[in-house]
Regions:
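Charged, often Cys/His-bearing segments associated with DNA-binding zinc-finger transcription factors
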Residues: 3-32, 287-310
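Basic, flexible linker segments flanking DNA-binding modules
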Residues: 4-13, 30, 35-126, 217, ...
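Residue-level signal for the short linker/turn that defines the boundary of a DNA-recognition helix
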Residues: 23-25, 68, 84, 242
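Mobile genetic element proteins and their domesticated derivatives, centered on retroelements
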Residues: 29-30, 40, 58, 73, ...
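Short small-residue beta-strand/loop micro-motif enriched in glycine and branched aliphatics
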Residues: 39-42, 154-158, 210-213, 237
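RNase H-like two-metal-ion nuclease catalytic core shared by retroviral integrases
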Residues: 49, 188-192, 196-201, 210-233, ...
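Mobile-element integrase/transposase regions
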Residues: 83-148, 154, 166-175, 179-184, ...
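C-terminal domain-tail junction helix/linker
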Residues: 206-208, 229-310
Length: 310
């Protein structure tokens, strides 16, 4: 019979329980628990009708606002005209067994980086990928996948869907690698699509190292965040997208102009395609090993894929 006894009221209740079970005398129980016999024999005065009404209202407010602590509950009661202090309310809540349950911390899944944080020094050195969200005029969700080369700033993939799963992002990554060659490193956040086992197996098979940024640190993926800022400012905020098909056409046209026409200040005001052609001749695409599972492989290519890839 082991209990954690802290307050005098708890010690008194425990001592009475021991005495009622005839396990010990009253004097012995008080001596063992460090409780005065006057405290053992103390019986509080019965609650007044006003006290009963206060307790009833306290329970009502605590049920209505389960995340409010004793300070806010006391403030609400004083607003209603009750003359109470916060310590009084704290004691009443404790007597009633009321408390604000602690917030459960969310388990943050994190990918395991297989490469060190690296700054791109040549084409296909570091790629980065991420999502950006938008909506159609009627409120339909749009989720867009972006894949960039951090050195040339070329946008290899910009694809819109209602929802994108790990098999979908792997499909578009495969197509980008088949056309542009494989990167040495792939940078991303810890999104569930990017740390999925099917993606991890494929990257390991094709010897592509991963660089996962710290949770809640988008600045560590600054290239794609900068691109998304330009994309939203120059395209998404200016266009009214009514359907998914229209969204694919619009973002495909933006990707083409971004790669081939738009001057980029970091590239000496050349377009990414011009910079890539001048400074780094196109490498021969490397051969790919098949994925370790068939879940991420698609047999039929989407008819609109030519608007997503170069």
């Amino acid at each position: 019979m082991r209990k954690k006894v802290v307050s005098p009221a708890q010690r008194r209740a425990f001592a009475r329980e021991v005495v009622n079970q005839e396990l010990c005398s009253q004097r012995g129980a008080c001596r063992i628990l460090g409780l005065a016999r006057s405290t053992f024999n103390y019986h509080g005065r019965p609650p007044t009708p006003a006290e009963e009404q206060l307790r009833k209202r306290l329970l009502e407010l605590s049920t209505e606002h389960p995340r409010y602590g004793y300070r806010r509950i006391a403030a609400l009661l004083r607003r209603e005209g009750w003359r109470v202090g916060k310590r009084h309310i704290q004691r009443l809540r404790r007597d009633e067994g009321l408390r604000v349950p602690p917030t459960k911390r969310k388990i943050v899944r994190r990918g395991v980086s297989t490469g060190l944080p690296t700054t791109a020094t040549h084409r296909n050195h570091v790629w980065t990928w991420d999502f950006i969200a938008d909506a159609t005029v009627r409120g339909g969700a749009l989720k867009l996948l972006t894949i960039l080369d951090e050195y040339t700033r070329e946008c290899h993939v910009l694809w819109a869907e209602r929802a994108l799963k790990s098999a979908d992002v792997l499909h578009w990554l495969q197509k980008a690698v088949e056309q542009h060659g494989a990167p040495e490193y792939l940078r991303s956040d810890n999104g569930s699509e990017f740390i999925a086992k099917i993606v991890q197996r494929w990257l390991k098979t094709n010897r592509i190292k991963t660089i996962y940024i710290e949770p809640g640190s988008p600045w560590q993926n600054g290239f794609v965040e900068s691109f998304h800022g330009r994309f939203r400012d120059e395209c998404l905020n200016r266009e009214q997208l009514w359907t998914l098909t229209e969204a694919r056409v619009v973002v495909g046209d933006f990707r083409r102009k971004y790669n081939e026409v738009r001057p980029h200040s970091r590239l000496g005001y050349e377009s990414p395609a011009m910079f890539a052609a001048r400074s780094c001749p196109f490498p021969a695409p490397v051969g790919l090993r098949p994925p370790s599972t068939g879940n991420g492989q698609r047999n039929n290519e989407n008819i609109n894929s030519n608007k997503c890839l170069d």
